Amino acid sequence: MKAFLLDTVTVSEFRKIGRIHPAVDQWQHRHLGDEMWISVVTPLEIRKGVHLVRQKDPVFAAELDEWLINIILPGFQHRMLGIDISTALQAAEYRAIHGLSPNDSLIGATAKVHGLTLATRNSADFQATGIQLVNPWEYSL
């Protein structure tokens, strides 16, 4: 059994019921029995998106917030990893040496510290870090 840390872009893709990218859908079904984790940064990024889109599209913002509160938070309640000192120090390295954004640094460091494979569409952003990566958008049977 494998264990994955889902990047926010991957979690967001799962929301697209009926419109999910075919490769991501295949990857998700292939790994149904595997452990899927998220970082506390993912709800932060989703909630930030809610606030940013609220002015333009209040209906979508409300749907996104409802999905966060009713699906993501309870669904990952026991599979959401926080930021401890080891994660913070690793994130500092990724930020300083590899130029990752603050959020990507924290997500990448969480994967590294917990020995998880990071499932992300943005694998090129993390390539130089040595983190184990998988791009579900490139999955094929």
Describe these PLM feature segments.
Residues 15-18, 50, 95, 130:
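Short, flexible helix/strand-to-coil boundary loops that buttress conserved ligand/catalytic motifs
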Residues 48-51, 74-121:
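Active-site neighborhoods of divalent-metal-dependent phosphate/nucleic-acid chemistry enzymes
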Residues 1, 108, 113-141:
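Acidic, PIN/NYN-like endoribonuclease modules and their adjacent C-terminal/linker elements
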Residues 11, 43-46, 88, 126:
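A generic structural signal for short hydrophobic patches within well-formed alpha-helices
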Residues 37, 81, 134:
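General small-molecule cofactor/ligand-binding pocket signal
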Residues 1-38, 52-68, 140-141:
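Short, well-structured N-terminal submotif of metal-dependent ribonuclease cores
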Residues 2, 26-30, 71-72, 80, ...:
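Short secondary-structure boundary/capping segments
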Residues 7-8, 42, 122:
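A secondary-structure boundary/capping signal
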